[in-house]
Amino acid sequence: MSFKVNWNSLETDSLSTWTKEILTNALNSGKSPHILASNISIKDLNFGQSAPDFEILEIGELDRDRFRGIFKISYSGDFHLTLHTKVQANPLNIYYSNSLEKEVGIEDSEFITPQFGLSNEQFAIPLDLKLSDIKISGIGIIVFSKSKGLTLVFRNDPLDSIKVSSTFDTVQVLANFLQKQIESQIRDLFRETLPTLIHQLSLKYLSLDNNMNELRTKLAANASTSSSSTSSTSSSTTSSSSSSSPSSFTSSLDSANTTTSLKMLENEEEDFSLVYSAKNLQKNLKLFKSRETMSLHIPRFRNIVQRTHLDKFTKNYPNLINSLALSNNELQKFTHHPHSHNAVPIDIFKNESFEKTDGLLKDISNIQAGNYYKFATQKENTVKPKRRVIRLGKSKNKSKSKTETKTEHNDENSNNDNQIVPLSSTPASSSSSTLIEEMVEEPSTPIMKETSEFINPATKTTPQTQIHHPTPRKLELRVQADPELHSEVSTDLHSRSSAHHALYQEFIRSTQSPSLYDKVLTTCGGVGLGNTGYFSFVPQRALSASPIKALNEELNEKKSMNHMDFNRVSQRLEEKLKQNNGDMLRKNNSMNSNSNSVDAEDKPQLVHHDTLSATAAAYAGLFTAPPPPYYH
């Protein structure tokens, strides 16, 4: 039995990138030798145009879960592969690293070793290695078992010849060395590496059946924990309110899912084979291809509805309109129309009498209540769903009772308002009042009462429950009567405080004409801004806003306690400096006179005494000895 391989199907970008990734990971896995200065990368990969020949010589055993056969493979094509890396060209560095690894056994420099300057430096050279003209002819044995995987063994050495070319082909010694090394590595690949890789991959993809017991134990443990949690939640829901029912419902669903998964694992031949078997994968592949093409053959899956057959499935699906059509024959015409949601069309409630719509609403409420009771976890502890109830004919009684309570409340407030005592008696707003109303209680003296009545005879105080914001009023002259009475009242008022008395004394001193002060006292106008004269008589000079005005020179020149005169301070400083300078000169003169009297004979004579000034002659006694030399 022989086969033909479609070799052109391998010329795809996805396959080439996938093979490059696999080869790079395989070549760089493990410990790299010290002669390589970098990782190995694939520069070029081409499968060629000629395909290998594959022939089955013998089939020794063939069963549902096992296979054993002998095959022959031969290839002589134009496949080529180019690798790129960097090689270490410094032999001392290679020898140093190898000696550390072999003799010392430590890669790091923990052991005391000599450190050379340039001999241990790296010197990397790029290397391109091309493998081409591969010829393979070998006989192999394939053994497949569902429990042990796939095993491949070659009886002979399949590699006949291979051509190795690199950047070091000019050096014949290196070219021969590379040829021998690569041939030996490829022979080891066919002898040991390739069978082990194929066996490991087969175990990876066929280990589902071997791990069935582990899956069963894990799912059983999850089912036991979920069942215990559901039992605890069910016991808590019996004592708790209806708000905890959704959580118990979800936990019961989880436990149901775990139990169904356990049932699926128990039936290995039926359900579990559909999930993990190759037949299920083939069905999925057919389904995928049928959707890509216009194929009419669509495979069927258990408990799965195709999108193309969804209308047939939803036509008989139990929804609200279908359940209403069972009792009302008039609604059957609406059941044939597809609906994307579980709702009743609005056309049913249009152009219908009130009795029919009322009956439909009752049917809908009964269906919803029945579904609620049906899917509840425990029928004994179910709570009836709350419905909105509208009661007619009770709004009038409530409105009457509200109006009666409001009237009673207003009567009580009116009674309380009549019992309130006013805080103060404020006069009515008039143009002759002052600028700001005083809301404080006035002293209850007979004199103040008389004056207030005299000033505003026409106004009457009325009790007010609320304090209003004062309104500004214009300044006007007041018509005054009985000056004797007012003078007595004003003198009594101003004599109460000593501060006012001192204020008047300052006012008397500051005024230029005493007749004006007498006029103010006689008219009892007071010391205010509005009192300008005697019987609307305007004085010759206008009074200032402040009653105290400094007109004397002493008051103008008067300084504060914190005032500082800097001119006087500077004068005192100059006097002090002059005095200190005089004392210093006197001391120097006395010292010079004493030194002249004692050491007159030992004093050295100055050479240039005639060129010195008078001041230098005065200080000649100071230079008795030359100064010491200056050292840096």
UniProtKB/Swiss-Prot annotation:
<feature type="compositionally biased region" description="Basic residues">
    <location>
        <begin position="384"/>
        <end position="400"/>
    </location>
</feature>
<keyword id="KW-0496">Mitochondrion</keyword>
<keyword id="KW-1134">Transmembrane beta strand</keyword>
<dbReference type="GO" id="GO:0000002">
    <property type="term" value="P:mitochondrial genome maintenance"/>
</dbReference>
<keyword id="KW-0445">Lipid transport</keyword>
<feature type="compositionally biased region" description="Low complexity">
    <location>
        <begin position="224"/>
        <end position="252"/>
    </location>
</feature>
<keyword id="KW-1000">Mitochondrion outer membrane</keyword>
<dbReference type="InterPro" id="IPR031468">
    <property type="entry name" value="SMP_LBD"/>
</dbReference>
<protein>
    <recommendedName>
        <fullName>Mitochondrial distribution and morphology protein 34</fullName>
    </recommendedName>
</protein>
<comment type="subunit">
    <text>Component of the ER-mitochondria encounter structure (ERMES) or MDM complex, composed of MMM1, MDM10, MDM12 and MDM34.</text>
</comment>
<dbReference type="GO" id="GO:0015914">
    <property type="term" value="P:phospholipid transport"/>
</dbReference>
<comment type="function">
    <text>Component of the ERMES/MDM complex, which serves as a molecular tether to connect the endoplasmic reticulum (ER) and mitochondria. Components of this complex are involved in the control of mitochondrial shape and protein biogenesis, and function in nonvesicular lipid trafficking between the ER and mitochondria. MDM34 is required for the interaction of the ER-resident membrane protein MMM1 and the outer mitochondrial membrane-resident beta-barrel protein MDM10.</text>
</comment>
<feature type="compositionally biased region" description="Low complexity">
    <location>
        <begin position="422"/>
        <end position="435"/>
    </location>
</feature>
<feature type="region of interest" description="Disordered">
    <location>
        <begin position="384"/>
        <end position="435"/>
    </location>
</feature>
<dbReference type="GO" id="GO:1990456">
    <property type="term" value="P:mitochondrion-endoplasmic reticulum membrane tethering"/>
</dbReference>
<dbReference type="GO" id="GO:0032865">
    <property type="term" value="C:ERMES complex"/>
</dbReference>
<keyword id="KW-0812">Transmembrane</keyword>
<comment type="similarity">
    <text>Belongs to the MDM34 family.</text>
</comment>
<feature type="compositionally biased region" description="Basic and acidic residues">
    <location>
        <begin position="401"/>
        <end position="412"/>
    </location>
</feature>
<dbReference type="InterPro" id="IPR027536">
    <property type="entry name" value="Mdm34"/>
</dbReference>
<feature type="domain" description="SMP-LTD">
    <location>
        <begin position="1"/>
        <end position="203"/>
    </location>
</feature>
<keyword id="KW-0813">Transport</keyword>
<feature type="region of interest" description="Disordered">
    <location>
        <begin position="221"/>
        <end position="253"/>
    </location>
</feature>
<keyword id="KW-0472">Membrane</keyword>
<keyword id="KW-0446">Lipid-binding</keyword>
<dbReference type="GO" id="GO:0008289">
    <property type="term" value="F:lipid binding"/>
</dbReference>
